[in-house]
Amino acid sequence: HLMRGDSYLLNLCVSTPVETNLTLRHLFRFARAPYRMLLGPDARISGVHGRGCVCFSPEPFVTVRGRSISTFPMKGTVPSATQEARRWLETDEKENRESATIVDLMRNDLSMVATGVRVKRYRYISPVETSKGPILQCSSEISGLLPENWRSRLGEILLKLLPAGSVTGAPKEATCRAIAEAEDMERGFYTGIFGFFNGRDLDSAVSIRFMEEDERGMVYKSGGGITVMSRMEEEYQEAVAKVYVPFDF
């Protein structure tokens, strides 16, 4: 699909078996993350895949304050927090093109629901502490202005923006078809969104950094962006870097 030009950025996800004595509730309790989610009172929802899951996401999806809506696509991860790693993330051609593709996609998506859409911050780098040591992640911020009646149309607005571009790719529709062919797992709640709306403002996050439990045991779902410029070893190391739990005991 990439070589034919059906997609020029495809976010491919994999499932990694995990062995641990901790329950999903323990993982939720001790994980450090801006956004955390535990499904169900006992981490299970009856009738929905029969699974329990926990998410400790560093990536906002959209936030709304007043009428201002912002989205923060995260693209680019390096398993180190050294100056050398930062320079690589800032200058690598593949990482730069990947960011540009997703920022353009999300700018177009946001323009379907908001006016005055602009890129406020482009490719800012943030450290993330993990149980394996720090990693660096690259994000951008895109903002616009919602209509006065956005609260009564919140569901419609979110549906127009989904699925999140940072976990699918571009062009979105063709890439989603390619993902369905390529992946040998069911994503389920992984790469969806979750959040909180208090009647005035909205906070939401992309369901990444995600562990799931079923009758076979526990798995960690992770992934990354693939392009025609991808180098196999670098993509593998990025996927490994994302299999972590940001614990705080």
Give, region by region, the residue ranges found by the protein language model.
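Extended alpha-helical targeting/anchoring segments
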Residues: 1-249
